[in-house]
Design a protein with these regions (language model features):
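Conserved catalytic-core motifs characterized by acidic clusters
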Residues: 5-14, 95-98
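Short alpha-helical "patches" and their helix-cap loops
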Residues: 40-56, 75, 128-141
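Short intrinsically disordered, low-complexity coil segments enriched in acidic
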Residues: 1-6, 10, 139-144
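Short, contiguous alpha-helical
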Residues: 13-67, 116
Length: 149
């Protein structure tokens, strides 16, 4: 059996990560590609809930890396459920996603955590979109910001 040296850091895809981060990236790939196969057979398929529970807390780093800015300045509250989290999505010259305390009044997107993860991975096409609530937000514009990995 081998042992990983503590403090091991890797530079992947212009991001610094450790072994835990690498495992989380692989989990995300596995969960999304499993969904890719499942949805071909069952249009109502979803990403595994246990994977969603782990991935939602690191979706900000992925959004920053995967987002393709269009130059349009936006600040959007993203409220997700199952599990419940609140973020602020910013766009302009870059795409950013940070945790939010929910205090300021912003245009808002409300959807499941599973659907939001698929949006960031570029997998929230119209044919596979569960119910969402968008107040002052154009979901099609957000789809263009996250064209897929």
């Amino acid at each position: 059996m081998w042992r990983v040296a503590s403090g091991l850091h890797l530079r992947l895809f212009e991001m610094d990560t450790d072994i835990t981060g690498l495992a989380r990236m692989r989990l995300g790939e596995h969960a999304i590609h499993t969904w890719d196969v499942a949805v071909a057979l069952d249009p109502s398929a979803t990403v595994a809930p246990d994977a969603v529970g782990l991935l939602i807390d690191t979706v900000g780093q992925l959004a920053t890396w995967a987002g393709k800015p269009d130059g349009r300045e936006r600040r959007i509250r993203v409220s997700v459920r199952d599990p419940e989290r609140n973020f602020v999505l910013t766009t302009g010259e870059a795409v950013g996603l940070t945790e939010s305390d929910g205090e300021e009044s912003l245009p808002e997107l409300r959807l499941s955590a599973e659907a939001f993860i698929r949006l960031v991975y570029g997998r929230l096409g119209r044919q596979h979109t569960p119910p969402v609530e968008a107040d002052g937000v154009d979901l099609d514009e957000l789809r263009q910001l996250f064209p897929g990995l």
